[in-house]
Amino acid sequence: MQKNLGAALPSTVWEAARAGQTQQVEALVQQGTPVDARDPEGKTALMLAAMNGHTATAQRLLALRANPALVDRDGLTAAQLAAQRGHTRLVELLEAAR
């Protein structure tokens, strides 16, 4: 059972980040999900939070040492993904964290 739970953690953290569920993201990372785990498109939880405008989730991921300099399969950083969707405050936060 624990093995299956561990296998499900990365997809769960991606879903939580995409939905802006900050406390769930933090709990999953503390349970052992790598903070920079990538989804099939190469996106991290930080990228998913950023592109969906979830500032509090992005701040928490940065505090958990998520790397804002990573790029997805298209070569885009979390800041660039946020910029594409007009999330200016997130762009500033992510650029300052680099």
Go through each PLM region and give its residues.
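Conserved ankyrin/ankyrin-like repeat signature
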Residues: 24, 56-57, 89-90
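Ankyrin repeat domain, specifically the short helix-to-loop turn at the C-terminus of the second helix
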Residues: 26-34, 59-67, 95-98
